[in-house]
């Protein structure tokens, strides 16, 4: 059974017309984007963004927010830290398509072992990680060095 949230704190709503070659916007108008299919997916590689880019930004922002909160609670200096999120899409052996994600932390003011621990804890706190756990491959790393996790 999926985990259930106990209280809805915020709801985002978006409308897309035209799928991957269309246009998307949020109900509050803060995001209003054209969508294009990358050439690697036999698209026209137009000037618009795509769902994978939007997912990468959303996941990285959410994950880093979780990490920053944990770092503050442990009195670690996360100033200047960055999360790089890489999202890949491809065919599944069983049919359809799937995603894979890699999250890499660059934290110049945090010791390597502390940074690894932050990545593991953020992975447990981040809503994107909780939503995708067990469904897609997520690779965690610090400065390109893998962080083993379940």
For every predicted segment, state its role:
Residues 1-57, 64-150:
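Extended beta-strand/beta-hairpin segments
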């Amino acid at each position: 059974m999926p985990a259930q949230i106990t209280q809805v704190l915020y709801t985002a709503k978006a409308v897309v017309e035209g799928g991957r070659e269309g246009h998307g916007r949020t109900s509050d108008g803060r995001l209003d984007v054209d969508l294009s299919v990358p050439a690697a997916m036999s698209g026209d590689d137009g000037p618009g963004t795509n769902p994978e880019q939007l997912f990468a930004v959303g996941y990285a922002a959410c994950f880093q927010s979780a990490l920053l909160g944990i770092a503050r609670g442990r009195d670690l200096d996360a100033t200047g830290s960055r999360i790089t999120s890489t999202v890949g899409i491809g065919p599944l052996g069983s049919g359809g398509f799937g995603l894979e994600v890699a999250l890499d932390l660059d934290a110049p003011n945090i010791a390597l072992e502390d940074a690894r621990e932050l990545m593991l804890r953020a992975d447990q706190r981040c809503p994107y990680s909780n939503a995708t756990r067990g469904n897609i491959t997520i690779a965690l790393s610090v400065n390109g060095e893998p962080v083993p996790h379940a």
